[in-house]
């Protein structure tokens, strides 16, 4: 039976050093969905009863910014083999010297170098998404995608617990990877509520970022890859602009699809309606959400949670999402009007046009912010994850 965690009362400890240690292993600290979870656990797990150390592939200077509590495997310029060796050396030393009570893997490849050193009884996998399937969607060869899936399966099946972000990913872990349901725990993701609840007006946010004050703005914060649905969103914008000519779509993020997206906008005559922002600094991201009228999450495939939807709600801005993966689980409790009928361009256009013309009502800024604080705070996520960790101590 699949279980959603409840928050248990945390044990009391006299000092941080007396807490059981949870070693976190991942790709990145602070960037992307997985990296943000790692950073939030580093910040909030101690209050939930676990000391945290970790090792990641990037950034290079992570040791300096975390007081040595996180290490980089190797310089980001290093070869994959050198990163692999660095992971084995540094993780192996932490296992030997610090003896963590929990080994928490956020990415199967970088846990592979220490498979022979990890006891299955203390291994927890944080399942952020199907690496092999995502790489296939992004253009990897069948052989490469299959090899990645084998690495994933070997880790997930060894794990004492597998933490997933949604009911959709719980089903995927069981059906695709053969994880036993009684080992799966559902812990929704989180947003740093206080960081995104900037408490400024939309006008102030737009002035700060140099965005127009007199146009309705749609925002989409995405990696620029095909499954994120940006081609469909730009196609939908053609229909929206026919009814709301002053509409502006701001796309934030980087990726290999940038040139194709720009060409699609040009071909559809939307050069004045689409603005590509590229990478947006973490300090500016809360203001970017606040500047928008609607945050659009048009995912076409493989979305476990949808962190950008939770972040947007925390900023007080409604997020309209496709009914893909775990996205409906993020917004359904707030309003079903936040879900598109389908991921197709025509349904994206219909839903957004109805809102912009006042035919469909979305939750208010205050309702969005209150819902995010109640359901997606980082301390709440940390307490739920700590409860899972304690199950296997």
Language model segments and positions:
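Conserved donor-binding/catalytic core segment of Leloir-type glycosyltransferases
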Residues: 212-228, 234-237
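Short alpha-helical donor nucleotide-sugar binding micro-motif in glycosyltransferases
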Residues: 279-280, 287-292
